[in-house]
């Protein structure tokens, strides 16, 4: 059955092999003339069909590379080399089969992502019954936010959700490229597409199927697979010169020898399979390699653009920095202990939605300080929170808000990039908690790597205040800073940056316009910044800036492989054509040799799958040294 499907998949190969067999039988029974006519009619039909395809390509704006194959088939028929003509047909159709095989191999990782897309979810009938696993199956698209789902061992998590089970272990390799299992605890988010471990778990749906992480990845992969624009453009650049060289060599051989057969013998070695097949295979391999590394490039055009990048611009908050405040110091007032101040503040901040509150709670948990429940709590928007804990009134917030309730409040001296939350207990100032948005530990290494790898200009484009932006930029090695920008100003600056192409990296909704305006927009998509991801050309699925290095390195490796495979094919073809001009390579032998050239270039193009080494070594600064550059701190948004 498989053999029959292959015959139907490649009908031209099947018909050509049958034509070969029939011509061979006719030769055996001394009917060479009939065999000649059958071969001639068959090849002529293929020529007509190929010409129709060429016209369609030209109408779509692409150069018809098959012109050399058509001329070669016509020339071999004209001089009576009908066996060579059949071999050329077999070579072209075989080249398409090789392209199909190599393309399937190259897009294997992309296809794996699509094939693993979750389709069914188990919705629990009675979520309140911890002992009951009775559930009904629904399509993933029908899961509603808040549904409690059962995920059995080794099943794929269908939608993004909050883990309700005490602990679970998940394989997130399809999302992040991390091969080791990852442990998640109750209350933590589990992304769709992760594979559950050896025990059943429960989770509450945070997002619908369409909005979940894996389904967004699938949409991006579909978009990447459907794009072939750069491959065609890359081949078109070589098509006309290669065609001209081949025709000149063939015409010269005919003119010097006076033998029209020599024209056909040269053109047989000029078929353009390295251009038609090797380059597309290399680009597909690059897209697949990137996807496996947690980087989705939306089209092949991006692979070529990112390979040639000469300028890079970065947003600050959430891109160069971690985008979340971390506690850097506790300054207790006289009579208060640092841990006591932090514990009371964190307990009160359980009832606040402010960004600083999360950093304070995280710091308390990291120090092993239990959060206590409040008898009552209220939050004053943009100012702070008040809670009654163990009979004590705890107030946390802005200095003016806390001072209105505790007149002895003392403002803390803040360093560049620091923000403070002030704490009062029972009307007395208890201390200040200093927080900062720390730079990503890999940010300096990424900037250094780009500078060392032919990126001539690195800039920061941010809406943050200049003093903070310049402090971060200085510590990360970025010399050009544009601060206090509105989105339209970011777009204008991205359009003006030279040299080009320009790469822009951002993560937030306000970055979407500038990501769309840049030559290559890269979105840090791990946190679900949908608008930025939609506008970007590249989406990084892992919360790591080091993946920018992966994207550039894979793009350059892929383009290098594509160009090298093209030049290998062209070099071998031109060399063989020069030899054929002397009459040393008959048409039939030339057609067979050219098939080997095609195979060699395709095998070389598959090197794009291996790719360069991924990521920056921990602690690397881009120069091979072990030290990590100093970490900058930037202010978290104030209350």
Positions of PLM-derived features:
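Actuator/coupling domain of P-type ATPases
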Residues: 2, 23-24, 34-120, 124, ...
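Cytosolic catalytic headpiece
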Residues: 112-113, 300-520, 553-556, 608-609, ...
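Membrane-embedded alpha-helical bundles of multi-pass transporters
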Residues: 2-6, 25-26, 51-59, 71-79, ...
């Amino acid at each position: 059955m498989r053999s029959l499907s292959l015959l139907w998949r490649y009908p031209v190969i099947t018909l050509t092999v049958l034509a070969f067999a029939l011509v061979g039988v006719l030769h055996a029974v001394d009917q060479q003339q009939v065999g000649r006519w059958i071969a001639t009619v068959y090849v002529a039909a293929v020529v007509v069909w190929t010409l129709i395809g060429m016209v369609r390509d030209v109408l779509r704006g692409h150069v018809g590379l098959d012109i050399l194959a058509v001329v070669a088939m016509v020339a071999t028929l004209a001089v009576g080399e009908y066996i060579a003509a059949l071999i050329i047909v077999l070579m072209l159709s075989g080249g398409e089969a090789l392209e199909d095989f190599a393309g399937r191999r190259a897009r294997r990782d992309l296809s794996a992502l699509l094939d693993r897309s979750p389709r069914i979810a188990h919705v629990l009938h009675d979520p309140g019954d911890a002992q009951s696993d009775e559930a009904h199956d629904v399509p993933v698209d029908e899961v509603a936010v808040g549904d409690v789902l059962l995920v059995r061992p080794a099943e794929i998590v269908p939608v993004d959700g909050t883990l309700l089970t005490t602990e679970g272990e998940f394989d997130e390799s399809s999302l992040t490229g991390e091969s080791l299992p990852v442990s998640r605890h109750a209350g933590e988010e589990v992304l769709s597409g992760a594979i559950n471990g050896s025990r059943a778990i429960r989770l509450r749906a945070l997002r619908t199927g369409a909005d979940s992480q894996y389904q967004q990845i699938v949409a991006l992969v579909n978009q990447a697979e459907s794009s072939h624009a750069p491959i065609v453009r890359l081949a078109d650049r070589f098509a006309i010169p290669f065609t001209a060289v081949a025709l000149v060599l063939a015409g010269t051989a005919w003119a010097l020898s006076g033998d029209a057969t020599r024209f056909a013998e040269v053109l047989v070695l000029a078929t353009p399979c390295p251009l038609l097949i090797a380059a597309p295979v290399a680009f597909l391999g690059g897209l697949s390699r990137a996807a496996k590394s947690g980087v989705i490039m939306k089209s092949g055009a991006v692979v070529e653009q990112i390979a040639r990048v000469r300028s890079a611009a970065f947003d600050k908050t959430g891109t160069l920095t971690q985008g979340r405040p971390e506690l850097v110091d506790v300054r207790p007032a006289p009579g208060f202990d640092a841990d006591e101040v932090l514990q009371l503040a964190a307990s009160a901040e359980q009832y606040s939605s402010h960004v600083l509150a999360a950093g304070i709670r995280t710091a308390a948990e990291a120090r092993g300080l239990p959060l206590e429940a409040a008898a009552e709590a209220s939050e004053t928007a943009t100012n702070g929170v008040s809670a009654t804990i163990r009979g004590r009134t705890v107030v946390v917030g802005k200095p003016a808000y806390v001072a209105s309730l505790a007149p002895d409040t003392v403002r803390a001296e803040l360093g560049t990039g620091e923000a403070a939350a002030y704490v009062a207990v029972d009307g007395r100032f208890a201390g200040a908690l200093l927080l900062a948005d720390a730079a990503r530990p890999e940010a300096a290494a990424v900037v250094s790597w780009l500078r060392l790898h032919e990126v001539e200009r690195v800039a920061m484009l941010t809406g943050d205040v200049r003093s903070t932006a310049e402090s971060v930029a200085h510590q990360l090695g970025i010399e050009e800073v544009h601060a206090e920008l509105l989105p339209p100003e970011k777009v204008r600056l991205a359009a003006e940056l030279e040299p080009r192409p320009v790469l822009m990296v951002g993560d937030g909704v306000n970055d979407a316009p500038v990501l769309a305006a840049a030559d290559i927009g890269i979105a840090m998509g791990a946190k679900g910044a949908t608008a930025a991801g939609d506008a970007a050309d590249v989406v990084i699925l892992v919360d790591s800036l080091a993946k920018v290095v992966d994207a550039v390195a894979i793009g350059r490796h892929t383009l290098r492989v594509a160009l090298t495979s093209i030049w290998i094919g062209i070099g071998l073809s031109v060399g063989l054509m020069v030899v054929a001009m002397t009459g040393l390579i008959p048409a039939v032998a030339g057609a067979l040799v050219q098939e080997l050239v095609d195979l060699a270039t395709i095998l070389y193009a598959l090197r794009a799958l291996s790719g360069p080494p991924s990521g920056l070594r921990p602690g690397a600064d881009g120069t091979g040294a072990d030290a990590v550059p100093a970490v900058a701190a930037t202010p978290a948004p104030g209350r």
